[in-house]
Amino acid sequence: MALLALGSVFSHEASAAEWEELPVVPVLGPVVVGHLEKVVDRGERFGNRPGVFAKIGDSITASPSFLQALGCQSPRLGAWSELRGTLEFFGAAAVPRGSEEARCSVSNSYSRVGVAAVPGWRAVDALAPLESPPECQGLPAVSCELQLLHPSVALIMFGTNDLEDFSAVEFRRDLARVSRLVSSAGTIPVVSTIPPRPRQPFSQRVARFNAEIAALAENRALPLWNFWRQMAAPGVPDQGLGEDGVHPSVLCPPCTAIDFRPAGLRQGYALRNLGALRVLDRLRREVPIGDGR
């Protein structure tokens, strides 16, 4: 089911069931693909790089467990060997080094943690001007990261911190501004639902925020990565969360998040990393951002 085939089912009163049933990886209908092709055309004029993506978000995005190991280590793909081409496609392009740990001798889209992925951040924080690096003074953090990388895709997830400070409607306004900045730079914005947060009073707020994220994706013809559904799937212990009940879990030992075999996929960060690769693979195959089709 294409996102836009759902009609206008998402309102401020949307029930949880409406967004919970959306697929993990978006089915890109013709309206969405048409919109994304226009974004890509704009990006080509700006010199954006097909094999580069940006990571924009809070601690769940800035974590060393999110994609960084794929920068220089081979994952255990298990049943997901069809992702190897996409894994290599987005790993081949060098990008400026970010704040990541020095675990990779090269810097690519996987290993880089840039200026728009910061622990504790809310969507509004990514819109604030940065004092550094010097070439980005006065620019919002999101715009700075896009200027530094010229990416074709941006993986965006905010909301985990926002739900403690803002209403769902206020959050959607800020996330919409982030997505507009990204698309205006010729970069495809992928918006993501946030993971479960079972402790009260947050579980109901997660549902409201995710309904707004889904509504934004539908109304703006954006790809929606339903990360929540990965985490809430049957058989995932503790809904994929670590001991703090907020951040995804990691398989320890060996403390890896790139084992995509069944045992590894019982942990939240492995699910998140696999989801990211699947989303990137879908975009590469169905939107002309490289050699995928």
Language-model-detected regions and their locations in the chain:
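Bacterial N-terminal signal peptides
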Residues: 1-9
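Active-site segments of SGNH/GDSL-like serine hydrolases
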Residues: 160-163, 178-211
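Catalytic His-Asp segment of secreted/periplasmic serine-dependent ester chemistry enzymes
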Residues: 197-293
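Active-site-proximal beta-strand/loop segments in catalytic clefts of secreted hydrolases
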Residues: 56-60, 156-161, 192-197, 226-231
